Amino acid sequence: MEKKYPRILFRKRLKDLRKDMEEVSQKTLKTHKLAVDLLMEYDEEKKEKVIKNSRAIDDMVFNLERKAISLIAAEQPVAGDLRFIEACIKVGSHLKRIGYLAANIAEAAEKLKDEEIPRRPLEDLKHMSDFVQMMLSKGIYAFLDQNMEMARELRHDDDKVDDLFDQTLEHVTRSMFEDKESISYLVNLLFIARFLERVGDRAVSIADRTIFMITCEKP
C-alpha cells in the first residue's frame, strides 16, 4: 500500500492540473466572446470586465505553469504524462496571449463606440470574429478531449480566417477612400481584424501542440 501512495498522489496532482487547465480555458473563451461582442454593442462595464479577466487569465496561467513545473520536478513523469504537462505549459502561454488580445480588441472597440461604421466592413468583422471564436473553441476542446480529428481541422480553418482578414482589409480600405475623414477611426477595424487573426493563429498553435502531445510527432 505504501508503494502505491506516491502514484496516487501524482494522479491527484495531475487531475488538479487538468482542472486548472479547464478553468483558464473556459475563462479565455468567455473573455474573447465578451470582447468581440463589444463590436456590435459597446458597454463600458463589459469592456472593464474583459480587461479584468485578461489580468486574471495572466495570474491563472502563472499559477498553472508553477504547478506544472513543480510536478515535473517532484514526480519526474514520463511518456504521455510528461507530454501532457508540457502541453499545459505551452497551451497556457497561448491562452495568456489570447487574453491580452481580447483586451486589445475591447480597447479598440471603445474607440469605435460613437462612430458610424459602414455596414459591409462591420459585417465582415462580425463574420470573422464568429469564425475565430469557433476556432478557439475547437482548439481548446481538441486539447482538453485529446481529439486528433478536431485538432487537424484547425489547419483548414486557418486558411479561411486568412481569407476573411483579406476581405475585411479590402472593404475597410475601400470605405477609407470613400470617406477620408473616417480613416482616423476605421483604422481600429483593421487593428481588430489583425488581433482576431492572431487569436486564430494561437488556436492553430494549440491544435498543433495537441497533435504533438498525442503522437509525439511534428504536425
From Swiss-Prot:
One of its GO terms (molecular function) is protein homodimerization activity. It is found in: Cytoplasm. The keyword Cytoplasm applies. Keywords: Cytoplasm, Phosphate transport, Transport. GO terms for biological process: intracellular phosphate ion homeostasis; negative regulation of phosphate metabolic process; negative regulation of phosphate transmembrane transport; phosphate ion transport. The keyword Cytoplasm applies. Transmembrane segments: none annotated. Gene3D superfamilies: Phosphate transport system protein phou homolog 2, domain 2. Pfam families: PhoU (PF01895). It comes from the Archaea. Its main location: cytoplasm. Signal peptide: none annotated. One of its GO terms (cellular component) is cytoplasm. Belongs to the PhoU family. Homodimer. Plays a role in the regulation of phosphate uptake. This is Phosphate-specific transport system accessory protein PhoU homolog 1. It comes from Methanothermobacter thermautotrophicus (strain ATCC 29096 / DSM 1053 / JCM 10044 / NBRC 100330 / Delta H). The lineage of its organism: Archaea, Methanobacteriati, Methanobacteriota, Methanomada group, Methanobacteria.
